[in-house]
Curated annotation (Swiss-Prot):
InterPro entries: Ald_DH/histidinol_DH (IPR016161), Ald_DH_C (IPR016163), Ald_DH_CS_CYS (IPR016160), Ald_DH_CS_GLU (IPR029510), Ald_DH_N (IPR016162), Aldehyde_DH_dom (IPR015590), BADH (IPR011264). This is Betaine aldehyde dehydrogenase. K(+) 2 binds at residues 243, 450, 453. GO terms for molecular function: betaine-aldehyde dehydrogenase (NAD+) activity; metal ion binding. K(+) 1 binds at residues 27, 93, 179. NAD(+) binds at residues 149-151, 175-178, 228-231, 251, 283, 380. The gene is betB. Belongs to the aldehyde dehydrogenase family.
Amino acid sequence: MRAQPAASHFVDGRPLEDETGAPIPVIYPATGEEIARLHEATPAVIEAALASGARAQAAWAAMRPVERARILRRASDLIRAHNEELSLLETLDTGKPLQETLVADWASGADALEFFAGLAPVVTGETVPLGQDFVYTIREPLGLCVGIGAWNYPSQIACWKAAPALALGNAMVFKPSEVTPLGALKLAEILIEAGLPPGLFNVVQGRGAVGASLVTDSRVAKVSLTGSVPTGRRVYAAAAEGVRHVTMELGGKSPLIVFDDADLESAIGAAMLGNFYSAGQICSNGTRVFVQKGIKEAFLARLAERADAIRMGDPLDPEVQMGPLVSQAQLEKVLAYIEKARAEGGRLVCGGEASVSPGCYVQPTVFADVTDAMTLAREEVFGPVMAVLDFETEEEAIARANATDFGLAAGVFTADLTRAHRVVAQLQAGTCWINAYNLTPVEAPFGGVKLSGVGRENGRAAVQHYTQVKSVYVGMGPVDAPY
């Protein structure tokens, strides 16, 4: 099989196999070909990963931050040097076209490692003067962390979680999605090649039961999950039993508001990026596109032209712009949402069908005349299906944009920057864009509010989620006791 790794797991600095675990077939979604076969982590594999991580963490935390930074920077350089082959593997694992994976996946992971390498040596505490006494604070690592990844950006997510954890002196056991398990193994190999001591980044494969075993282990201090809201609820509850630190980056049903003074081509381009990039399988997608009534029909006409011109096909073809969904199960789910939208009265503007057999393809799809009550406007589809809703006033757009249990992201397109800032100040979302969409530089915090999650990834804000503060009171005089 063309993408078979050396072993299913990577523990304590080397590949580890245990073929008694349940098989995990890895399917290339463009063709249905089985490209690798892994095995689920057994209790022995899980124990080895947790034990080696706990054992290695103390010495790593004691290392000078600048030395930790050098290792992470070398890992970043190695990723960039091997970006082409890593991107090819990402395409086979996910079905995303090379046109995307070459610029968006491992490249973002390398950025994260480099950014947190630079941040590690400058994370400091503070001094609080109290007369002749004083208090100083120390930012300390949490200890052993568990990362649980999603299948849509498997390698990027692994890097986004590993980079701050390792830079700040923690160890991590990472469980990728069983749907896209290959990239995390490569990251583990790269980190060892860069000089990371064994045990600090371990990878174990498996489904929900493996994740549950990791999350509930008494040695684990922190859990970081990227996934769906139902999965997040379960993991959050399990982590709470041990009063563990958590970061949850969950689902979204994000609004993209287009006012009638917006640059139409830019707004349409953003709506397409926010619905069709990665075949629509992005948590922050702006899947509720609110368009002011005066420009709605012009917006839809031009959108249909551009959507129909998207090149679909073999993800390994560098000219292809959109690949398949990640799996047959996801394809069936998305097609069911399309049929539901038809049944509930949505006006199909373009797409709406499965495409390019035998892979898991669906056409870029746009529904107009969508109302807030329709399923398409309320539930996360996670496929290339855009809902276009119209509005009249700014106040109406804000109220309807916020009328959701999600709060991951939002976007505003307008030529009036005063209005843009006024609107985003009222949007209930963790990440907002003005005249742009779905750009997530590692220098900026990323995360949601409401059911879209807690905590933040990336930026300086991530430091708070992988460290804890110790306060030290220093008495400079005799103790004055009343007895």
